[in-house]
Amino acid sequence: MALPIIIDCDPGHDDAIALVLALASPELEVKAITSSAGNQTPEKTLRNVLRMLTLLKRPDIPVAGGAVKPLMRELIIADNVHGESGLNGPALPEPSFAPQSGTAVELMAKTLRESAQPVTIVSTGPQTNVALLLNSHPELHTKIARIVIMGGAMALGNWTPAAEFNIYVDPEAAEIVFQSGIPVVMAGLDVTHKAQIHAADIERFRAIGNPISTIVAELLDFFMEYHKDEKWGFVGAPLHDPCTIAWLLKPEIFTTVERWVGVETKGKYTQGMTVVDYYFLTGNKPNATVMVDVDSQGFVDLLAERLQYYA
């Protein structure tokens, strides 16, 4: 039986590729997709979800737009990474269908209520929508199998010295998620920076030769440009968000540890930092499965294998 999932995302190049991977995988049943604000404005990320589903010929999947700003802060976007549209690079189709009239939280709640089995929530943007769901529907917590997030880091941040972008955008929301009592799986920068795509990988995807693999290659052509900055020390570009889907499909290519994680919401230098109690110093029981390593070749091979689904 396919694993039922809800994807909450803010496309974004790597979010878009996470959608491509999920919808090429019969092991997963994508029951709903909601959009969050982060990589671009809420209007643009919602439009990008619809554009990707139009490209992938999946207008059957319910879509809803989420919160327009973080719980307690003004919105920060990463247009310097993802471009003016949020998905600069390839020529994507205009949406062929409209989102649901309700909110992301309403669609998530409806999906959870109607599911015969607990649902995994995959969240690849700021945690605002998921936190709002948890706060407004405590009766549905038992319907959530786990929350798999791309966010945080044990070591270095990528938006501030201490904080990864998704968590920094809405640290209060992330703290709600981590302390919810629901199992959390964290794909942080410690692992996603190892899940790099190189120029040869992009050409491998392009050579698959179907329309979707070509679009993915063109998305990566653009995404690579930002990551060529010498300050990062990257050879390729880290594909952050697809790590969440890849973990669901092939957990054996990841190394994980069980640890307690908290989110700093007030620090002068550390707002948005995920504090991972690696050495069990706090006495707190682990609340998260934290990814710490990945077989990077296995990750690339999985993407290449699933791109052939679209032939």
UniProtKB/Swiss-Prot annotation:
<dbReference type="InterPro" id="IPR015910">
    <property type="entry name" value="I/U_nuclsd_hydro_CS"/>
</dbReference>
<dbReference type="InterPro" id="IPR036452">
    <property type="entry name" value="Ribo_hydro-like"/>
</dbReference>
<dbReference type="GO" id="GO:0008477">
    <property type="term" value="F:purine nucleosidase activity"/>
</dbReference>
<feature type="active site">
    <location>
        <position position="240"/>
    </location>
</feature>
<dbReference type="GO" id="GO:0006206">
    <property type="term" value="P:pyrimidine nucleobase metabolic process"/>
</dbReference>
<dbReference type="GO" id="GO:0045437">
    <property type="term" value="F:uridine nucleosidase activity"/>
</dbReference>
<dbReference type="InterPro" id="IPR022975">
    <property type="entry name" value="Pyrim_hydro_RihA"/>
</dbReference>
<keyword id="KW-0326">Glycosidase</keyword>
<comment type="similarity">
    <text>Belongs to the IUNH family. RihA subfamily.</text>
</comment>
<dbReference type="InterPro" id="IPR001910">
    <property type="entry name" value="Inosine/uridine_hydrolase_dom"/>
</dbReference>
<dbReference type="Pfam" id="PF01156">
    <property type="entry name" value="IU_nuc_hydro"/>
</dbReference>
<keyword id="KW-0378">Hydrolase</keyword>
<dbReference type="GO" id="GO:0006152">
    <property type="term" value="P:purine nucleoside catabolic process"/>
</dbReference>
<dbReference type="GO" id="GO:0005829">
    <property type="term" value="C:cytosol"/>
</dbReference>
<protein>
    <recommendedName>
        <fullName>Pyrimidine-specific ribonucleoside hydrolase RihA</fullName>
        <ecNumber>3.2.-.-</ecNumber>
    </recommendedName>
</protein>
<dbReference type="InterPro" id="IPR023186">
    <property type="entry name" value="IUNH"/>
</dbReference>
<dbReference type="GO" id="GO:0015949">
    <property type="term" value="P:nucleobase-containing small molecule interconversion"/>
</dbReference>
<comment type="function">
    <text>Hydrolyzes cytidine or uridine to ribose and cytosine or uracil, respectively.</text>
</comment>
